[in-house]
Amino acid sequence: MYRAGEPGKRQSGPAPPRVRSVEVARGRAGYGFTLSGQAPCVLSCVMRGSPADFVGLRAGDQILAINEINVKKASHEDVVKLIGKCSGVLRMVISEGSSHVEPSSSDEEGGLCEGKGWLRPKLDSKALGINRAERVVEEVQSGGIFNMIFESPSLCASGSEPLKLKQRSLSESAALRLDVGQDSLCTPHPSMLSKEEISKVINDDSVFTVGLDNHDDFGLDASILNVAMVVGYLGSIELPSTSSNLEHDSLQAIRGCMRRLRAEQKIHSLVTMKVMHDCVQLVTDRAGVVAEYPAEKLAFSAVCPDDRRFFGLVTMQTNDDGCLAQEDEGALRTSCHVFMVDPDLFHHKIHQGIARRFGFACTADPDTSGCLEFPASSLPVLQFISVLYRDMGELIEGVRARAFLDGDADAHQNNSTSSNSDSGIGNFNQEEKSNRVLVVDLGGGSSRHGQGSSPGWESVSGRGSQPWSAPWNGTFCHDSEAGSPLETSPNTDRFWDLTKHSGPVFHMEVPPATLRSSIPPSKRGATGSSCGFNQRWLPVHVLQEWQCGHASDQESYTDSTDGWSSVNCGTLPPPMSKIPADRYRVEGSFAQAPLSTQKRDWSRKAFGMQNLFGPHRNVRKTKEDKKSSKLGRGVALAQTSQRTSARRSFGRSRRFSLTRSLDDLESATVSDGELTGADLKDCISNNSLSSNASLPSVQSCRRLRERRVASWAVSFERLLQDPVGVRYFSDFLRKEFSEENILFWQACECFSHVPAHDKKELSYRAREIFSKFLCSKATTPVNIDSQAQLADDILNAPHPDMFKEQQLQIFNLMKFDSYTRFLKSQLYQECVLAEVEGRTLPDSQQVPSSPASKHSISSDHSNVSTPKKLSGKSKSGRSLNEDVGEEDSEKKRKGAFFSWSRSRSTGRSQKKKDHGDHAHDALHANGGLCRRESQGSVSSAGSLDLSEACRTSALERDKAAKHCCVHLPDGTSCVVAVKSGFSIKEILSGLCERHGINGAAVDLFLVGGDKPLVLHQDSSILATRDLRLGKRTLFRLDLVPINRSVGLKAKPTKPVTEVLRPVVAKYGLDLGSLLVRLSGEKEPLDLGAPISSLDGQRVILEERDPSRGKVSTEKQKGAPVKQSSAVNSSPRNHSAMGEERTLGKSNSIKIRGENGKSARDPRLSKREESIAKIGKKKYQKINLDEAEEFFELISKAQSNRADDQRGLLRKEDLVLPEFLRLPPGSSELALSSPPPVKGFSKRAVTSHGQEGAVQTEESYSDSPATSPASAQSPCSAYSPGSAHSPGSAHSPGSAHSTPGPPGTAQPGEKPTKPSCISTVQEGTTQAWRRLSPELEAGGIQTVEEEQVADLTLMGEGDISSPNSTLLPPPPLPQDTPGPTRPGTSRF
């Protein structure tokens, strides 16, 4: 490793001060020391285990001579150049300092882990300088010191040294990197800075004095995963030993290896290639990590020229002691590992199983519409791997530089220059070149290779042949042989053209290969004073930007937009390069302005920047202003520092940046034709607004303030950070009637910042939020599920995070629903256009609502006070059609106008005010606090706007994907395919079946709506809609006094007493005189407990006073006949029959024996309290005939009045349809039909409680997921064997019953116990027919009765009937239609 005579090991202690001569071989990462000061220069640090350490150099030693040149009084710059020009053994005369730093102090700089290669050095804040800054940046950028370097005899300045493996230190001195490329001892460049200017640039620049002393900022956990991609492993082949012609031989061997394995058609083994920050791991689905390639052993990678699917990784073999293995002095052992990328696995559906097998979740790539883990080509993989490349020496760099060239170009040796620029602190990531070269796959396009016949790298064309090299060399090297910038401009332009066709990742930012390239020896001349402008200088501006940005490591990668993203030819992976990293940049974290104009000018002057980028300016003029100084001084270190700082952060943040919500992927609000790239060149998220193709200057995104509107499309989080964005988003939500969501989110955000110790303020704000948004009487209720409900006791002990769950739900609702539509809305488009054109943002009130806005009225809220019943009279079809083109203001006006008509449904609005009862409480399975989920719950008439909005957006829905989103009770969501010809019932039956949900125990609602949907509608009308399943409680109720049992479905949040009172009242019983207990228990049941506690239970009602049961029974016998006639007298009556009443509303069901006339009286709610106090006994004296007649009169008057004023009163509404008229001889049926049961939804059921074969449910009374045992009126009772269908006139199989004692039934007959099935079903059929016009119009029909979901009769029978006849058996619906249901997928 070292020359004879060199000390073999470190001296044990500091040597006495003396002058001695040492020879230091260039090691793996350089010489291993850093310099400071001048005249003479002093060694400020010596890396432990480095060549300098081995020869006994210590910190504090003074350099007196270098290669027989006296430098005792030379400037720092001159010493740096001399050291940098020497690529072989460095001969120095040093004077040992009197105060040597203890050898262990080099630990601060980092050391060697035995067998592990170089560790990242730690920073020494006492020695911060250009050297330290460069080293640190380089360290952070690359992630570790690599163990490989190839040297050629011709690389040495003298040209006489044999090829050896030498070590280079990681911690190069700044001076060594300052190697400006011109031998100042010979011919100073006229534009070079003076020594004073150079010193001022270095000393004044904050980057060298601030922020680099904290090694924690740069140290990264090596286990951080950068990316994981699934590739196929074919095999590994050891490459033959090579000599001086390593580049050609290695490249040919690699290609031969890949061709051989490909020709053998070896079956590849799928492995996950994990690119870590310091290694590449191969992981199988069973055995775990099977191979690991440390970064220091990676030489380079290449794509197979014959088949781009194949690529190879070349690794160097090392000995156990960490040194590279050497078979002899001139050869190294290398291996090529060949992999392939299978494009057939690109599509997500195809590789889902593979992803599950490997145990990871796919990350969507919005640009390729695929997944990052399954690339379509090998380029993304190579781009990630290339980040790990280290400085392996110029020979390996030559191999890398040619790795992508076509075979025809192999004859032209890629004679890269020697790495004289690597002045000891080296490990100046040569991968910079390879990174860029690897990505820029020029194929056979690059034919201007230098014709260097010598194997000794004598032509700059190795990299100069690649178009970017010549201009650099021409600029830096004042040599007649070196091409001038003008001469190489055509090459550069040609390269740019090539990269255009290669995709955005190929856009040149800085000449990749030549960032470190020096002029080859042949052009340097024998004197060694060549113009090898070793651009080792670390750009001050680059360092400053890197340092400033690194403070926020999570976002530091965002600055990659300025040079380390797509334009940088592969320094970052395709997803990162295609999605501007700036999208997640917090303003101010990067984009620091240059230090000053003076410093920028100095830097340009120092490094020949005035004419450096001449050929490139017209290509990257949009980046010129921001990056001129950075690119001008653009050395590989600068790029690697910026790039890998970004890369590393990207490694951590990859999931955050790429697994983005749907709204980010759909944020293309402006087409390419509307906004050009020039218009959006500074837009933070321009690729969200127009395609990359139209944005040649995508990477110049910078000024957030100037493009704030465009930044709103970056992410929903970004939108919420901008007060102006929040204001416009709030205006948008206001038009969609969902402003309460953003208000709630803001209130919760403010609440979370209240100090935890301020209990008074917390309590006040908590109750304010609760009363305004969450309670049952909230003025602006928000839509959250039952799991997020708050109990009263929580409000008594508030804490800042108590609303976190609710806030997150609303946040997600806005993000995945409202935000996406906002980006597509006309309001946002107007804002974007105004910003691009330089105008002030438009007034949100002047911008009309977009179609998306109209559409969202139904999906977000049914909060307009619209008429309650669409189905009662066929009015819905006509009224909705007439309103199709109306504006929101018209809808509001109509809603307010029609809100009074809600009273026709038993004074519902008044009741709502008093009781805060809302259908959306269905989700509250745990009996939590009730709350309304939409503003429309103030009235139960929101479905008009739902249908209107649905119809107005019918065209858009037809174009959209045919699916809908269903939110399940457990908080998850499913995307359900909808298909024309399949009913909602069929679709949801399959959904419930797949998820193990009891279809009978749920109801289906529109998100934001409070009415169940009618399940017989065609499922296609649900396309693109958001739905939710609300839980219900199923239980059996045994009425012992009358020997009856009923199966009930109730809203889980209702108290037991609210549910049982209307049921027992319907059967003429008084709940107060009955004992309620659970089967098998003797203790009375707590009637105040939530009904959810009875789910699946059997509840028994027993008499406390036996005489009361007899009175009730006698009372029942006379009622059915008259009640039946009342039912049939009104064609609208069935509308009310589906209503289910809660506490205080039981009068609507207590038609017999109670104040029936108040069932539709608006003043009912006021009388309920008195009813509860006075008791049922008093009301039993009321004449039931009069009550029924009054009930019908009220119903007719209110219904006709509403229809008449709306212009919807029709003749058929005034006459009972034929199919509802009782046929002659069907008096028995009339006698057996009691009055309509309010508080129950009506469904035809068989004698076993299941739906009849010819079931036609009332359009508004079906429950989601097709209840297996559809509910009927609670007064309907079937004896075994009695089948029933929608109307006796049309149902040959319907059985007609004769009057009989309650609770009894004869075979084939229905018991006379309340049994209004026939009339109910006739009304149902009529209702269904009336709905058809609206269905044809594309509207979504909902159950219009307000309380329809509160209580539903599932089945009825004798008290001895088995449960299966009363309640549907879980978990699968039994009435699922036959046709196959479209599948669902959980996300």
From Swiss-Prot:
Low complexity composition-biased segments: 849-869, 1261-1280
Omega-N-methylarginine-modified residues are where? Answer: 524, 633
Give coiled-coil spans as residue ranges. none
Record keywords: Repeat included?
Answer: yes
Gene Ontology cellular component?
A: apical dendrite; cytoplasm; dendrite; neuronal cell body; nucleus; plasma membrane; protein-containing complex; synapse
Per UniProt, residues of the RGS domain are: 715-832
SUPFAM superfamilies xrefs? PDZ domain-like, PH domain-like, Regulator of G-protein signaling, RGS, Ubiquitin-like
**Subcellular locations according to the entry:** Nucleus; Cytoplasm; Cell projection, Dendrite; Synapse
Q: Which CDD domains match?
A: PDZ_RGS12-like, PTB_RGS12, RBD1_RGS12, RGS_RGS12
Q: Which UniProt keywords apply?
A: Cell projection, Cytoplasm, GTPase activation, Isopeptide bond, Methylation, Nucleus, Phosphoprotein, Repeat, Signal transduction inhibitor, Synapse, Ubl conjugation
- Reported tissue expression: Detected in brain cortex GABAergic neurons, in striatum and substantia nigra, and in the Purkinje cell layer in the cerebellum and hippocampus (at protein level). Expressed at high levels in brain and lung and lower levels in testis, heart, and spleen.
Q: Which InterPro entries match?
A: GoLoco_motif, PDZ, PDZ_sf, PH-like_dom_sf, PTB/PI_dom, RBD_dom, RGS, RGS10/12/14-like
Domain PID per the UniProt entry, residue ranges = 227-339
All copies of the PDZ domain together span 21-97
Segments of skewed composition (Polar residues): 412-428, 1122-1133, 1315-1325
Which of the residues bear the PTM Phosphoserine? 171, 194, 661, 671, 850, 879, 943
This entry's Gene Ontology molecular function terms read:
G-protein alpha-subunit binding; GTPase activator activity; GTPase regulator activity
Taxonomic superkingdom: Eukaryota
- The protein's predominant localisation is nucleus
Biased composition (Basic and acidic residues) is annotated at 914-923, 1103-1117, 1151-1168
Quaternary assembly: Interacts with GNAI1, GNAI2 and GNAI3; the interactions are GDP-dependent.
Q: What does this protein do?
A: Regulates G protein-coupled receptor signaling cascades. Inhibits signal transduction by increasing the GTPase activity of G protein alpha subunits, thereby driving them into their inactive GDP-bound form.
Protein name as catalogued: Regulator of G-protein signaling 12
Which organism is the protein's source?
Rattus norvegicus (Rat)
What are the top taxonomic ranks of the organism? Eukaryota, Metazoa, Chordata, Craniata, Vertebrata
> Which gene name belongs to this protein?
Rgs12
